């Protein structure tokens, strides 16, 4: 709920910056927090609609509150916000956008999907809400997290300006029609430090072929290649029609103690997507069958070098393979048809109960909105069905697509490509992959033994190393064999002494301790005894202790899982005394003179002890 003398003036289209109050309620109408601050316009094309978005900046100078204190976004841990964005779906607004074609979800959906997919970009977190203006219902909105903000950058990445307007520690560039510096201006004069540094990087890539790995490594030290890949993949997948020359932001942190010190991308408005809106960028096609490689044809849209950099990086084999593998990692997971539709349906389910009141307030029909959502849903299904064949058609380096099945034999885990973990619990695991690129596998846990490749094609590889790289020629079954293991638990009886156990040269001092061994491995054990205790025996249920269980130094084969217990007993103690005690007499015990009494000595059981008296001359 927002209120203020002139806030309605702003939302009715007057570009003023009025003061006002914001109250934030939960779904049950319970007030969570409130404060006073400044409102300002949010949106460009969408500002022409009757239902408008706005930014809110809470100011502690008003004496009420310094930040909206609540965990607004389920995907984030942050719980204090001085600045927030409140949007009415922008250019996907229903009923106002593009002749009533909006679904009232696109922008929030793409940002949310990117977050759930853990793409290497920054997103505006989203939380659907309804808005009241001075007590009057104002419709379905989204609370959005502001990312081009030092509070955001400081909280998540420990990157911030040293002082306002400084060029140190933060460089942030934005393009919307033109390009400007958000952070990193530096001293007055032509250009900015951030722009100059970016231009230098663009020039370096243009002048130094990235097919040369040395040049590529140099570029990679300054530029987050994963962010570039994810940014181009996502915009190409959703067929964004106003990126590069609009809605493009990129930045890097300069604080050496912070994170994200390479240039990386931020998502901005993602509402002109999925064949919706005006084609401001001039992409070749906005249909579901648009080629995934279309971004490479866009010249230098926006004039900041993003596409020339992209095309140059694609000449590097490592980058190209990372790009294709990344697509398939995503296509088989968070950007799959199933997952994308699940997220869309779940987000629509949140706003659907409020859409009748939104429509009653602003116009349109419920059926019209439902049809728009159905069109969006069908477009997404058609798009994800076309992408793999589209890659094969437009990227001559790749072949396929082929089925890859990974099977784990034994107990262990394999990582395929990036973060696809296959273990003995989810094996066999089947995926679809392209040929013509390096597809990496690595055994990441368990006692790896060897690989086996079952295929109609021939592959040359070392079966005994824990990494494997395949250029697929057809369908393939990859078997990863792990040596069977047995768990041995070590214990001591009784507990509470200083005794430890030496196991293959490693001292175990915490009991019980369990160690996994390959089946039939020979294990050597011996006790390190507390001085007050002596060895009694070893106990086991199934493994055979050699030479016997009564030998302090022993070994066994890990043929079965078992508990091996070291039994110890307290040594007998002998106390020596002289009566009467006030003499110079002493006692010789095994050649050692004792002259302090009483003295207690512990001995192994049944040890022979020799004693003799050294008498005071008067006794």
Feature annotation, model-predicted:
Residues 1-15, 20-21, 30, 35-39, ...:
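Middle-to-C-terminal accessory/interaction subdomains
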Residues 400, 463-492, 548-578, 603, ...:
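Conserved "repeat-terminator" motif of extracellular CCP/Sushi domains
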Residues 2, 10-180:
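Conserved ATP-binding subdomain of kinase catalytic cores across diverse folds
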Residues 436-464, 521-549, 582, 606-619:
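Surface-exposed interfaces of beta-sheet-rich extracellular modules
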Residues 399-403, 433-438, 484-487, 518-522, ...:
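Short coil/turn motif common to extracellular beta-sandwich-like domains
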Residues 418-438, 464-468, 505-518, 549-554, ...:
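Short, solvent-exposed S/T- and G/P-enriched segments that are highly enriched in secreted/extracellular
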């Amino acid at each position: 709920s927002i209120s203020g003398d002139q806030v309605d003036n702003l939302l009715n289209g007057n570009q003023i910056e009025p003061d006002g109050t914001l109250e934030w309620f939960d779904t049950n109408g319970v007030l969570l927090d409130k404060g006073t601050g400044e409102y300002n316009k949010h949106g460009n094309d969408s500002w022409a609609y009757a239902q408008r978005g706005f930014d809110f900046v809470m100011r502690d100078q008003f004496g009420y509150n310094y930040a909206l204190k609540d965990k607004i976004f389920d995907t984030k841990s942050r719980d204090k916000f001085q600045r927030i964005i409140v949007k009415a779906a922008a250019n996907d607004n229903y009923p106002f956008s593009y002749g009533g074609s909006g679904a009232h979800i696109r922008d929030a959906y793409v940002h949310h999907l990117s977050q759930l997919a853990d793409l290497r970009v920054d997103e505006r977190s989203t939380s659907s809400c309804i808005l009241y203006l001075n007590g009057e219902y104002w419709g379905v909105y989204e609370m959005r997290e502001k990312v081009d903000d030092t509070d955001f950058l400081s909280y998540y990445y420990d990157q911030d300006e040293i002082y306002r307007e400084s060029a140190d520690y933060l460089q942030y560039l934005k393009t919307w029609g033109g390009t400007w510096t958000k952070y990193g201006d530096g001293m007055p004069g032509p250009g900015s430090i951030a722009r100059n540094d970016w231009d230098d990087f663009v020039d370096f890539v243009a002048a130094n072929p990235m097919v040369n790995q040395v040049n590529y490594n140099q570029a990679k030290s300054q530029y987050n290649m994963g962010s570039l890949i994810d940014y181009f993949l996502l915009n190409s997948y959703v067929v964004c029609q106003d990126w590069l020359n609009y809605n493009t932001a990129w930045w890097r942190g300069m604080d050496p103690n912070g994170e994200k010190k390479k240039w990386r991308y931020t998502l901005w408005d993602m509402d002109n997507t999925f064949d919706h809106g005006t084609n401001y960028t001039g992409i070749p096609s906005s249909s579901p069958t648009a080629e995934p490689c279309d971004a490479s044809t866009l010249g230098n849209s926006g004039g900041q070098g993003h596409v020339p950099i992209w095309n140059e990086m694609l000449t590097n084999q490592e980058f190209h393979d990372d790009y294709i593998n990344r697509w398939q990692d995503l296509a088989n997971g968070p950007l799959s048809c199933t997952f994308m539709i699940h997220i869309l349906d779940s987000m629509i389910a949140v706003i659907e109960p409020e859409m009748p009141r939104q429509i009653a307030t602003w116009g349109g029909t419920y059926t019209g909105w439902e049809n728009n959502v159905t069109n969006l849903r069908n477009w997404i299904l058609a798009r994800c069905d076309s992408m793999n064949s589209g890659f094969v058609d437009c990227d001559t380096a790749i072949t396929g697509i082929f089925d890859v099945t990974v099977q784990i034999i034994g107990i262990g885990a394999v990582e395929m490509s990036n973060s696809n973990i296959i273990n003995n619990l989810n094996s066999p695991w089947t995926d679809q992959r392209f040929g013509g690129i390096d597809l990496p596998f690595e055994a990441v846990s368990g006692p790896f033994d060897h690989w086996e490749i079952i295929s109609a094609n021939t592959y040359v590889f070392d079966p005994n190393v824990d990494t494997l790289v395949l250029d697929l020629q057809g369908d393939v079954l990859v078997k990863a064999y792990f040596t069977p293991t047995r768990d041995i638990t070590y214990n001591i009886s009784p507990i509470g002494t200083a005794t430890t156990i030496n196991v293959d040269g490693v001292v175990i001092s915490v009991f019980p301790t369990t160690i996994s061994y390959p089946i039939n491995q020979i294990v050597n054990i011996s006790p390190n005894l507390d001085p007050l205790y002596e060895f009694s025996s070893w106990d086991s249920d199934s493994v055979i202790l050699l030479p016997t269980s009564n030998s302090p130094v022993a070994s066994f084969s890990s043929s079965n899982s078992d508990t091996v217990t070291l039994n110890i007993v307290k040594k007998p103690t002998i106390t020596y005394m002289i009566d009467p005690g006030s003499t110079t007499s002493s006692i010789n015990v095994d050649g050692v003179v004792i002259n302090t009494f009483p003295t207690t000595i512990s001995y192994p059981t049944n040890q022979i002890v020799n004693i003799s008296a050294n008498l005071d001359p008067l006794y």
